[in-house]
Amino acid sequence: MRTVGVFLATCLVTIFVLPTWGNWAYPCCHVTQLRAQHLLALENISDIYLVSNQTCDGFSLASLNSPKNGSNQLVISRCANGLNVVSFFISILKRSSSALTGHLRELLTTLETLYGSFSVEDLFGANLNRYAWHRGG
């Protein structure tokens, strides 16, 4: 039964994560600590692409994108700690779990699976300087 659960979880993660690779030529990015004026407002974020920690040397990353006002053209993209982004959405979805639609319950399960796939062991072989936190403008 556990094998079937792992298989289904892998399929769901594949459905949600793999399509982002076609939209993102290089999924591994540097997480940068930004000044307040450069942060994306939550209501302006149009897309969030999660990257599996297996893709970027043990690092779980996310791309937060925002279009130009009144346009479909992507103009702002920020790299974030994917584990923090996943944790944030898990927390939000769990707070209203009794009112979730089927799609949101499926998303919650997928996010929990993605979160559960992260382990400290992944970092043992990682090049910790490659995607290090940088102070940005």
UniProtKB/Swiss-Prot annotation:
Q: Name one GO biological process term.
A: symbiont entry into host cell
Query: What membrane topology was assigned to this protein in its record?
Result: Peripheral membrane protein
Query: Which residues are the signal sequence here?
Result: 1-25
A cellular component term, taken from the record's GO annotations: virion membrane
Q: Does the keyword Glycoprotein apply?
A: yes
Q: What is its main location?
A: virion
Q: Which family does it belong to?
A: Belongs to the herpesviridae glycoprotein L family.
Protein's recorded name? Envelope glycoprotein L
Q: Which organism is it from?
A: Epstein-Barr virus (strain AG876)
